[in-house]
């Protein structure tokens, strides 16, 4: 997968001149949306099928600061999938002559229908289910 590139905007920085911590969750979402498009399962397609994928947990480890105009490469991968819960992993690296990993994190998701019930992925979305299982298996191998 091609990493998602985010350029830090001035409004994302705080009084100390560094990227405010809350913006990293937004960057994760931007990268996840791009990742899903690269997989051929954009969120718009899932919503057309009546499937939503809410975030149920987020975990971040800040390793180094970023500042205005930094470019951050965000590598996204499927960390785990058990047929119900999907864990997405993120590694953010500040680009430049000496790239620096600035954040590692995870977000956990489930798949729900319009009534808020769990989607039976294996039965209702078998191609997507298989893709996620393969990607999770590759991560754990």
Enumerate the predicted regions with their spans.
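Glycine-rich, flexible loop/turn motifs
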Residues: 6, 12-14, 42, 51, ...
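HotDog/MaoC-like acyl-thioester-processing domains
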Residues: 2-4, 37, 67-68, 79-141
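Catalytic strand-loop segment that frames the active site of acyl-thioester-processing enzymes
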Residues: 1-35
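Hydrophobic beta-strand-centered segment that forms part of the acyl-chain substrate-binding groove
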Residues: 35-80, 85-86, 100-104
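Generic structural detector for well-ordered beta-strands
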Residues: 5-9, 61, 110
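Anionic, Ser/Thr-rich low-complexity intrinsically disordered regions
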Residues: 12, 16-21, 29, 46, ...
């Amino acid at each position: 997968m091609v990493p998602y590139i985010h350029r830090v905007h001035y409004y994302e920085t705080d009084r100390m001149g560094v990227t405010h911590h809350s913006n990293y969750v937004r960057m994760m979402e931007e990268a996840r949306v791009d990742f899903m498009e690269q997989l051929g399962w954009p969120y718009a397609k899932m919503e057309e099928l009546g499937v939503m994928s809410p975030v149920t947990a987020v975990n971040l480890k800040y390793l180094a600061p970023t500042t205005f105009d930094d470019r951050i490469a965000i590598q996204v991968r499927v960390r785990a999938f058990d047929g119900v819960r999907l864990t997405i992993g993120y590694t953010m690296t500040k680009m430049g002559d000496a790239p620096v990993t600035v954040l590692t994190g995870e977000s956990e998701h489930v798949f729900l229908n319009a009534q808020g019930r769990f989607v039976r992925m294996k039965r209702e979305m078998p191609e997507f289910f298989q893709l996620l299982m393969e990607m999770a298996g590759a991560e754990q191998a």
